[in-house]
Swiss-Prot record:
<keyword id="KW-0825">Tumor antigen</keyword>
<feature type="compositionally biased region" description="Acidic residues">
    <location>
        <begin position="82"/>
        <end position="133"/>
    </location>
</feature>
<feature type="region of interest" description="Disordered">
    <location>
        <begin position="189"/>
        <end position="224"/>
    </location>
</feature>
<protein>
    <recommendedName>
        <fullName>Tumor rejection antigen P815A</fullName>
    </recommendedName>
</protein>
<feature type="region of interest" description="Disordered">
    <location>
        <begin position="76"/>
        <end position="133"/>
    </location>
</feature>
<dbReference type="GO" id="GO:0005634">
    <property type="term" value="C:nucleus"/>
</dbReference>
<keyword id="KW-0539">Nucleus</keyword>
<feature type="compositionally biased region" description="Acidic residues">
    <location>
        <begin position="195"/>
        <end position="217"/>
    </location>
</feature>
<feature type="short sequence motif" description="Nuclear localization signal">
    <location>
        <begin position="5"/>
        <end position="9"/>
    </location>
</feature>
Length: 224
């Protein structure tokens, strides 16, 4: 009986030794000593997961980048073909624009020549008008100079209080003429008195001529 019970004790003893070893480990290492190892373990796990996530994201970006490059290449080919067509159209447009510019330049030259001819004709007409005006002014100045001293113009009689005055330009290119007296008032009165005397002398001469004609008509001096 005692022999049969020994293995059971041994078995139970072995189990008891295992449980005792575990308890001894817990008692052998304190919690403070285990925490640093746990921290390093957590750090390693986090770092590994972060690197794996980063590699996954990089793979996605590389795939997207390759797609973008392929799309850009296709678009560039299309744009190059479109640009070639546009260049051809631009060349044609430039050709026609050059022809239009040549035509416009030709017509512009003709217009410029016509304008030059019109300007020359206008200048000639203005010169002729200025010459005519200068000739008229010269003639008028001579006539006014001749009558400046209130002398009687041949074939005309000066009325009373009539005074001849010179005409001058008020502006450089006048639109109207302004007459102003040149001589003082006393001289004008004197000249007007002389004009009255001349008129009186002419009347006396006319009366004398009439008397002579009457005498010629009556040579004997008798009235009819």
């Amino acid at each position: 009986m005692s022999d049969n019970k020994k293995p059971d004790k041994a078995h139970s003893g072995s189990g008891g030794d295992g449980d005792g070893n575990r308890c001894n480990l817990l008692h052998r290492y304190s919690l403070e000593e285990i925490l640093p190892y746990l921290g390093w373990l957590v750090f390693a796990v986090v770092t590994t997961s972060f690197l794996a996530l980063q590699m996954f994201i990089d793979a996605l970006y590389e795939e997207q980048y390759e797609r973008d490059v392929a799309w850009i290449a296709r678009q560039s080919k299309r744009m190059s073909s479109v640009d070639e067509d546009e260049d051809d159209e631009d060349d044609e447009d430039d050709y026609y624009d050059d022809e239009d510019d040549d035509d416009d330049a030709f017509y512009d030259d003709e217009d410029d020549e016509e304008e030059e001819l019109e300007n020359l004709m206008d200048d000639e007409s203005e010169d002729e008008a200025e010459e005519e005006m200068s000739v008229e002014m010269g003639a008028g100045a001579e006539e006014m100079g001749a009558g400046a001293n209130c002398a009687c113009v041949p074939g005309h009689h000066l009325r009373k209080n009539e005074v001849k005055c010179r005409m001058i330009y008020f502006f450089h290119d006048p639109n109207f003429l302004v007459s102003i007296p040149v001589n003082p008032k006393e001289q004008m009165e004197c000249r007007c008195e002389n004009a009255d005397e001349e008129v009186a002398m002419e009347e006396e001469e006319e009366e004398e001529e009439e008397e002579e004609e009457e005498e010629m008509g009556n040579p004997d001096g008798f009235s009819p």
